[in-house]
């Protein structure tokens, strides 16, 4: 809590470094986004509304890419779940709009906290939400990768692995 994270969230050095010397608690972006999802304020975000509205108006597909895990430091699987919920608010089917999800799975931050949950667990969560919202013809998991290959700091030292991710996503 002292570094701006929710009480249930374990911090890391990133959060400590961000708050050293501030003399006050400042919520992290993670805490801010989760707070907006929980309060439903997330669903009136004008930028997100414009993305979906413009996609319907122009009959263009939407691609959503990001880290999907319960690690909580770099991302949260609830971001994707909320975006699926947001998609349900728009008439994507009539417009012929497809929402393509590109979750990047994260075993690194998650395995120490919840060892029984792996990437398949999070993909199933997404699939279940898509089905619950009746979006199985509109929203799909287009592809996935692991964080280690495309996002880690040392990926630059593993150019072949990073290049595979680039090719898969392009």
Q: How should these model regions be labeled?
A:
Residues 1-155, 163, 167:
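Active-site nucleophile/metal-coordination loop of metallo-enzymes that catalyze phosphate/sulfate
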Residues 170:
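Acidic/histidine-rich
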């Amino acid at each position: 809590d002292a570094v701006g994270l929710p009480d249930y969230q374990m911090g890391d050095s990133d959060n400590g470094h961000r708050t050293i010397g501030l003399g006050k608690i400042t919520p992290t972006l993670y805490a801010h986004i989760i707070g907006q999802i929980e309060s439903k304020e997330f669903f009136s975000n004008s930028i997100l509304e414009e993305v979906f509205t413009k996609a319907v108006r122009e009959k263009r597909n939407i691609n959503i890419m990001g880290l999907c895990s319960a690690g909580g430091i770099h991302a949260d699987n609830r971001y994707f779940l909320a975006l699926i919920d947001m998609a349900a608010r728009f008439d994507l089917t009539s417009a012929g709009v497809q929402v393509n999800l590109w979750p990047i799975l994260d075993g690194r931050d998650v395995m120490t906290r919840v060892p029984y949950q792996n990437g398949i667990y999070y993909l199933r969560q997404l699939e279940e939400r898509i089905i619950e919202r009746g979006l199985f013809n509109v929203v799909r998991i287009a592809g996935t990768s692991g964080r280690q290959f495309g996002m880690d700091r040392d990926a630059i030292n593993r150019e072949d692995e990073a290049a595979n991710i680039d090719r898969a996503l392009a």
